[in-house]
Amino acid sequence: MKYYADDQATLYLGDALEVLRALPDGSINCCVTSPPYFGLRDYGVAGQIGAEASPAEFVAALVAVFAEVRRVLADDGTLWLNLGDSYASGSSNNGGYSAKSTL
């Protein structure tokens, strides 16, 4: 759903896959996103990214989203992605998975 729009920018708020799937191919000039980390926080939303049963499922969810991002990006579009590594910092419970055995 559109969250904000003016003559220079449109911001969307909602489930990433649902919003992206509703957009036409090549219609976005820039995507700025910071997906939730795996196993770090529960936002209380069914189907939320980061609450998958395993790191492999988490990666698969991100791949699905970014395949749609690629589809909607213009040929000269840019993606700004903030994706931290909570495994490296040890700041997460990571759903009980150890850093060396996950991916």
Where are these regions (language model features)?
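S-adenosyl-L-methionine-dependent nucleic acid methyltransferase catalytic domains
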Residues: 1-103
